[in-house]
């Protein structure tokens, strides 16, 4: 296997908190899949959760070489967790099509947060 994509993104959590305070769930509904949105609504720190998912999806879009847009939507990238809590990444629709163009078969993701920031890195591997 070879690396065919690498992306990293960092988000200031307070920026997301302020956006949620101004606009309610508008950003969350745009960024999160339906399953992610359900978790967001029940999360003890929803803005932190949203910031981490936002960073993860931006990192994934960078790894795909498109950014968000150009056929890849936030909704085409799903960030989940294993039963042990490790993050997982799944691609659908435009993101899956772009991954196939890269001969990519698997995505690896790391997400971290500290007091003020959330950061994510995505590595895509080919066959």
Curated annotation (Swiss-Prot):
Catalytic activity reported? apo-[ACP] + CoA = holo-[ACP] + adenosine 3',5'-bisphosphate + H(+)
Q: Some GO term, biological process aspect, for this entry: which one?
A: fatty acid biosynthetic process
Q: Record's InterPro entries?
A: 4-PPantetheinyl_Trfase_dom, 4-PPantetheinyl_Trfase_dom_sf, ACPS, Ppantetheine-prot_Trfase_dom
Name any cofactors this protein relies on.
Mg(2+)
Compartment(s) where it occurs, according to its Swiss-Prot or TrEMBL record: Cytoplasm
Spell out the Gene3D superfamilies in the cross-references: 4'-phosphopantetheinyl transferase domain (3.90.470.20)
Listed GO CC annotations: cytoplasm
Q: Does the keyword Lipid biosynthesis apply?
A: yes
| EC numbers | 2.7.8.7
Query: Which of the seven top EC classes does this enzyme belong to?
Result: transferase
Q: Which UniProt keywords apply?
A: Cytoplasm, Fatty acid biosynthesis, Fatty acid metabolism, Lipid biosynthesis, Lipid metabolism, Magnesium, Metal-binding, Transferase
Q: Which positions does UniProt annotate for Mg(2+) binding? A: 9, 58
Q: Which Pfam families match?
A: ACPS
Molecular function GO labels: holo-[acyl-carrier-protein] synthase activity; magnesium ion binding
SUPFAM superfamilies named among the record's database cross-references: 4'-phosphopantetheinyl transferase (SSF56214)
Answer yes or no on keyword Transferase. yes
Q: What does this protein do?
A: Transfers the 4'-phosphopantetheine moiety from coenzyme A to a Ser of acyl-carrier-protein.
- What family does this belong to? Belongs to the P-Pant transferase superfamily. AcpS family.
* Listed name of the protein: Holo-[acyl-carrier-protein] synthase
